[in-house]
């Protein structure tokens, strides 16, 4: 008697699906896959649409589950056309390395995703597999505290002897983006902005990112207190605010900002630190942190330098000193100087 055909069954946390000759859009496919009822929660789905050389479309899909999903129905992942009675049946595989599948699915770039990709230790090269699994589990946690707890329980040796480095690394990995500044006044409140100052802002903020010049000039604004210069500078867009000293900690400094506001930082201090990097909008430079590893700064953005006249605060007076002649020539080439003689607003800001 012929033997019974082998029953279909795949048990895996990560599934790799390929739908040949599938006319569905990636959005339609993602919507149907999200609505599939499964005993274990779905964590991540990525759908990629690809065209064969003959022009026929097909879809690649990576699905990650919270735990192993035991699939016994080879039609479970079938998709349905919304316009006609057509079913699209996939080739179904358990993905041994979800990271490798993720890279493969990404190769043509026409993708859509839902959820958060779960790091797969099987893709890590070298080291013991068990340690890779524990590290992957820690990285997939939602907070530094949860990740540390996993390491403490499952990698106690690393927790005990590498605690300082662990905390430092996890601080960087789980650091939330700096909270965006919300200006208390609308930009239209500043009705007395000097023409040169407004022109500088319009030429940078009034155009698309692609149209902005490389290494746009910075601007140094000198004026008395309560002239509104800080509020004006902070109302132009997403920025880094460096007040009194320079702090490039990822909790307060973002490489995604459009510009820097340097407020009440003395010119002598800035000269010792990163004058040319910040005022010159230089790209890809490092800053040494007092209690940590050097921070990589993406750069390439201008700075608005704010200062008061006289004393040790005036950048103009500082650059007029004989020993700063070369720095003055460089700064005049890389920055616009504005001296305020009246408030930037009518009323109180």
Curated annotation (Swiss-Prot):
Its EC number is 2.7.7.-, 3.1.21.-. InterPro entries: CRESS_DNA_REP, Gemini_AL1_CLV, Gemini_AL1_REP, Gemini_AL1_REP_central. Residues 9-117 form the CRESS-DNA virus Rep endonuclease domain. Residues 157-177 are annotated as: Oligomerization. A motif (RCR-1) lies at residues 16-19. One of its GO terms (biological process) is DNA replication. A divalent metal cation binds at residues 50, 58, 60, 108. Its cofactor is Mg(2+); Mn(2+). ATP binds at residues 223-230. Keywords: ATP-binding, Covalent protein-DNA linkage, DNA replication, DNA-binding, Endonuclease, Helicase, Host nucleus, Host-virus interaction, Hydrolase, Metal-binding, Multifunctional enzyme, Nuclease, Nucleotide-binding, Nucleotidyltransferase, Transferase. GO terms for cellular component: host cell nucleus. Divalent metal cations, possibly Mg(2+) or Mn(2+). The active site is at residue 104. It is found in: Host nucleus. Homooligomer. Interacts with the replication enhancer protein (REn). Interacts with host retinoblastoma-related protein 1 (RBR1), and may thereby induce the transcription of host replicative enzymes even if the cell is not dividing anymore. Interacts with host PCNA. Interacts with host SCE1 protein. Belongs to the geminiviridae Rep protein family. This is Replication-associated protein. It comes from Tomato pseudo-curly top virus.
